[in-house]
UniProtKB/Swiss-Prot annotation:
The gene is sgkB. GO terms for cellular component: cytoplasm; intracellular membrane-bounded organelle; membrane. The lineage of its organism: Eukaryota, Amoebozoa, Evosea, Eumycetozoa, Dictyostelia. ATP binds at N257, P258, K259, T288, E320, G345, T346, G347, R468, R474, D734, G735, E736. It is an enzyme of class 2 (transferase). It comes from Dictyostelium discoideum (Social amoeba). Keywords: ATP-binding, Kinase, Lipid metabolism, Nucleotide-binding, Sphingolipid metabolism, Transferase. SMART domains: DAGKc (SM00046). Inhibited by N,N,-dimethylsphingosine. This is Sphingosine kinase B. The keyword Lipid metabolism applies. It catalyses: a sphingoid base + ATP = a sphingoid 1-phosphate + ADP + H(+).
Amino acid sequence: MENNNNEPAETVQEKGPKLKNDIDLNDQFKDEKEKKEEISSSSIENKNNNNNNTSTNNVIPNESNNNISNNNVISNENNNTNNNTDNNTDNNNNNNNNNNNNNEPVTSFTVNNKSLIEKEPTLFEFNQEQQIKYKNKSINSLIIKRSGIVIKISQKKSTIIYQDSIIACSELPDNFDTATTTTTTTTTLPIKVTLFTCVLKKKQLTIDKEQRKRKSYTFQFKSNQDSLNFYSNIQSTFLNSLPRGNPKNRKIRILINPKSGKKESHNIFKEVEQLFKDSGIKMKLTVTMEPEHAKKIGFKSNIYKYDTVVFISGDGLLHEFINGLLSREDYEDAKKIPLALIPAGTGNGLANSIGLQDPMSAALAILRGFTKPLDVCIVQQPTVTTIPVVDNNTVTTTTTTTSPTSASPTITSANNNNNNNNNNNNNNNNNNNNNNNNNNSNITKWCSILSLTWGLVSDVDIESEKYRSLGDLRLIIGAAVRILNLRIYRGKVYFLPAIPLDKSQMQSIPKCSFDCNICDSSNSVKVIEDLVCNDNDNNNKNKNEEQNEINSTTSNNNNNNNTTTTSTSSSTSTSTSTSSLTATTTTAKSTNSLSSSPRSDINMSSNSISKSLDIGTIPSCKVTHNSNLLNESSDSLLSKGWKCIEGEFIGVVASTVSHLASDFISSPNAHLSDGLIDLIFINNRSKLSKASLLSILTDSATGDHLKSDLIEHHKVKALILEPSIQKHGIVAIDGERIPYAKTSMENIRGCLNLICRSYH
């Protein structure tokens, strides 16, 4: 990949490799002809003076220098093209007092709640006698409250600047003297202080599709004391009290994938860069040059120099990075560093899941610094997978597969002894062949932040790469093509149920938010069960009042909290369905007990699969998990509460987030940090038609596809996928293709620290 910025390689980097295309935006002007534009040579962080020939025009000073100069920030407002309706052309030289009062972190309420802010007590007020001007006109008062600033323009007209949008306040002039009432000049001059914000582009009743822009507000104060009071209150009330401190005292590492999506990453960076400069935050930029570049950075670089690592890309770059990060010896400390995503890809599943699909909104969240734990799934496959693909009519391998008489998947439990006879024989044969080899070196591992997919979804995701230039249309076209040429896959899916709820009950699980009770609890399963049961009780009472006897049986069952799960597959037998629904509390506790059973029966692969993800010299992830999951026999799994579904599938999706793309809400009730996996699959049934699949595709844009009888939905803690070798297909994690083989997936709760918005 060509380096479009033509930056030389970094010559010195603490505790890390020499990585190409690293640009420290604190180290911009080293050529002699550019030195005259530099604010201060002491602002250069890198003492080795690399010659970085970038075109960026703002110097970001050394974070160790307490007198942080910000004079280019205000002057830059003259060139603001991002709908900055309140531009001010004042080009003041400002110094930062570096006020660092660390108060309790600010917590946001709901974006743009005018009635709430008007009821709040006043923290500081400037009245009409102090002759403050806004837009060169005198205002009645300027009121600072906990949730924002109220500008009383007249008795009937006011403007509110919400604290959610405030990112910086310009520094006071160099000639500012707190001992006098005016500036230290012979003539009294108004003192201008500019407030930098990132506001909603238009009035929005909801924030599901929010879009933001830069905006500045400039106030003129007649006395030094008034300007000092305003400046100090802004710093202490809104900026110093942010979770990661004042943005002007922070430093972030930015990784850009120039090939993400429609290749707009550089343009998106230029857009958010101006907001970062407004805030005074210090940046180091790296443009990835090749596959696995981000993985190397995550594994080797000294990330402790930064308080946040930012990715301007799709989900793939973050996927690469965490697979390097969690392979470090010091991963326990490294994983605490907040990660942030500014969406620039095609699907942008994670960004959509946290409501930050707008790049400017994502940049604002980075500056505000609120974080939330993020689940990571450990995906494992046998390293040695040499069984070739065979055609549908001939099987020439030593492994055996079952051939159910029905095309619909069958559900197996510990009580289904007849269905396990073949599995027992297979396990015995493989136990002898494998000699009870439990060596973890034979296991390949990946870390997943989104999903494991097999069948329709992975086919569309991987095979639509040729339509990447079309952006969002890529997935729509790919899905239409694949449904018209539908593929059916045979295999098994083992899963460990976490919650004994049926599909309709799971739809009443509250959606995830920043202050989510489910994610914040120590026992997410119990909280979910309590919430659902309470909701069901209320619904049943209403139904009983309206329909006394029609739904009496259903109401009684729900009110008695008999939450034994029932099969969501309408085509399976009653006895089989009942046996699969006995996932009680012992099921939820059995994850850690899967340790010492014999190796399971089949290790499948394809010699036609594209090359596996190249891990090079980077070891597998170090995160503690059940490394023997693939070695469990079928009988052992079933005896511990696992369920097995075997048969023909259209597609399988196992996800830990709500969205896999902007128009694909895989599981609306998925939570970022509940320790659970949403397992969703479509069985191949007699009543299944291409029209019904197209309907499911359309409904997936809102999450209503889960209401279809054709879809099964389970909340699980872990799963094992065994695709049949009789037909080649695609298995993918986070949109990245992996070998077509037996695959396990296990959720590690709250493993990472993700930047999120703090309002809902």
